[in-house]
């Protein structure tokens, strides 16, 4: 995926799915670097490894570095019929069936609560499906399923959780857009750059 702001590429999101017998590891790296007059104005980095076994989310190992001094190490594992995780709010004992807040997984939109992989916390979510919409991916026009995604605010959040607009085609994430709460005038677009029919 390319990360676009004001028609300029400001970063990338790379996700790899590594299959190993009955498990899949989803390794994702998101890098954003905004410069204004060649001076760094905003940086963000997130690396996450999710492990899924027989279709069930069983562990996570991640790290998030925000533009300020906030850094979070995210760890979580299935233990004794619970999902034991740690992050911004310390250790959490969660429902074993919780799934990560990761937009590649279309089924995540059906959940009421998800595990935020950037901060290691639980958020309640609200999703609304809109009318299908034609979008272009690599100059190919497709009719995509469109959703609006909102999530609850944590008391430690520095601002509201941004509203996301998501587009899927054949259950694959193609595009998403949101406004950074600190940069409300400009929309951030994250769009597939490796897809073709």
Where are these regions (language model features)?
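Acidic, serine/threonine-rich low-complexity disordered tracts
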Residues: 1-78, 108-197
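Acidic/charged, solvent-exposed loop-and-adjacent secondary-structure segments enriched in E/D, K/R, S/T
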Residues: 80-99
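Beta-strand/loop-rich accessory regions of lumenal/periplasmic or secreted enzymes
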Residues: 95-113
């Amino acid at each position: 995926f390319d990360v676009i702001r004001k028609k300029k590429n400001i970063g990338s999101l790379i996700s790899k799915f590594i299959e190993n017998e009955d498990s899949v590891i989803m390794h994702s790296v998101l890098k954003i670097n905004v410069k204004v007059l060649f001076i760094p104005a905003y940086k963000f980095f997130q690396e996450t490894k999710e492990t899924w076994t027989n279709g069930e989310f069983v562990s996570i190992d991640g790290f998030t570095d925000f533009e300020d001094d906030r850094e979070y190490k995210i760890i979580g594992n299935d233990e004794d019929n619970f999902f034991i995780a740690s992050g911004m709010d310390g250790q959490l004992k969660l429902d074993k069936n919780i799934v990560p807040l990761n937009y590649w997984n279309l089924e995540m939109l059906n959940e009421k609560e998800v595990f935020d992989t950037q901060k290691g916390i639980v958020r309640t979510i609200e999703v609304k499906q809109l009318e299908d919409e034609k979008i272009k991916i690599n100059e190919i026009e497709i009719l995509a399923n469109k959703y609006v995604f909102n999530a609850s605010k944590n008391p430690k959040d520095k601002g509201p959780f941004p509203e996301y607009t998501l587009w899927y085609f054949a259950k694959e994430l193609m595009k998403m857009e949101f406004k950074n709460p600190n940069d409300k005038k400009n929309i951030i677009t994250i769009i597939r750059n490796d897809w073709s029919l």
